[in-house]
């Protein structure tokens, strides 16, 4: 459960905190940064598609892995794909900024979906007596993921050569990889 918590905490700060700094260093206009608020909507409205995830099986995966694990695998592949797309998108260019918006929205949606599945899986995986331990282990992993996406990511970006004064796309690219 620690690793599932980590995989939930990591995307949150990659979208909201670390990305804002990256965009500012790339010289993205504040008006254009507002497009990235679409990524946050997925977290706010995940209750809308949560019942679908409970009811609909993922073709091919559900029969092999089960309902929850099938959705979890699909969501995690989408999270990784979105992070890779973000790493490949230079927001310092117009086309790169558009792809960055797409990747951030994709990351928000897939991460919110992953949160839905992990919460359901955590509740169903163990007996009631172990729920508190599972929840605390999940939260510890979540916090570690947030730490990695926040402070560690900024440390890496600086280590790869980007600063407030000098924008280095390659530094951010390797940080997100």
What are these regions (language model features)?
Residues 1-43:
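Helix-loop boundary and gating motifs at the non-cytosolic
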Residues 23, 27-28, 57, 117, ...:
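Short helix-loop-helix connector
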Residues 32-59, 79-80:
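Central cavity-lining transmembrane alpha-helices of secondary-active solute carriers
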Residues 42-49, 132-158:
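Glycine-rich segments within core transmembrane alpha-helices of 12-TM secondary carriers
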Residues 54-61, 87-91, 148-170:
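Transmembrane alpha-helix termini and helix-breaking/packing motifs in multi-pass membrane transporters
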Residues 58-59, 70-94:
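C-terminal ends and interior cores of transmembrane alpha-helices
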Residues 106-141:
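Cytoplasmic helix-loop-helix junction between adjacent transmembrane helices
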């Amino acid at each position: 459960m620690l690793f599932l918590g980590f995989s939930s905490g990591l995307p949150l700060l990659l979208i909201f905190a670390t990305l804002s700094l990256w965009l500012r260093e790339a010289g993205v206009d504040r008006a254009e940064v507002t497009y990235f608020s679409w990524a946050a909507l997925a977290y706010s409205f995940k209750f809308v598609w949560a019942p679908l995830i409970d009811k609909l099986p993922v073709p091919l995966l559900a029969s092999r892995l089960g309902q929850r694990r099938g959705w979890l695998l699909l969501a995690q592949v989408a999270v990784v794909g979105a992070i890779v797309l973000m790493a490949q998108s230079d927001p310092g260019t117009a086309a790169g900024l558009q792809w960055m918006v797409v990747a951030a929205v994709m990351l928000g949606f897939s991460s919110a979906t992953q949160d839905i599945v992990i919460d359901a899986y955590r509740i169903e995986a163990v007996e009631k007596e172990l729920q508190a331990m599972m929840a605390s282990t999940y939260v510890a992993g979540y916090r570690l993921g947030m730490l990695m996406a926040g402070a560690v990511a900024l440390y890496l970006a600086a280590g790869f050569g980007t600063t407030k004064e000098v924008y280095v796309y390659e530094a951010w690219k390797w940080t997100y990889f």
